[in-house]
Amino acid sequence: MSQLEQKLTEMLTAPVEALGFEMVGIEFVRAGKHSTMRVYIDHPDGISVDHCAEVSHQVSAVLDVEDPINTEYNLEVSSPGMERPLFKLQHYIESVGEVVTLRLKMPMGDRRNFKGKLLSEADGMLTIEVDNQEFVLAFANIEKGNVVPTFD
């Protein structure tokens, strides 16, 4: 998570939670002049378009006052979806047993990307099985993670 994403998460978590939603995480994607801020929310009963609009309105109001971003951007509010992004250690713990993709900040040997079954978490270390080989990765070294949807 970048410093900007961390700052935005800290700034927007309370307003999102005050509306009754979980702040799953924030991605800020720079693409030339067209940056996008994605706010992922969740709720035990699911997320509707009306929920996204409500959170978008609240988040926009906070961002208009705080003005933490010095470039133009589009705001997107959505549920995490089937390819649920994993932001917090708790998200990884909840995903043990599922297939995930992980990208590391710093390579492990010559490898930076992993796709496999998340086997366990212990003291901030994640064990993932890729092609019948186990890798133990530090949560602190994970740049990005997502659940891979499986259809059984």
From Swiss-Prot:
NCBIfam families: PRK00092.1-1 (NF000927). Signal peptide: none annotated. This is Ribosome maturation factor RimP. CDD domains: YlxS_C. GO terms for biological process: ribosomal small subunit assembly; translation. The keyword Phosphoprotein does not apply. It comes from Pseudoalteromonas atlantica (strain T6c / ATCC BAA-1087). Keywords: Cytoplasm, Ribosome biogenesis.
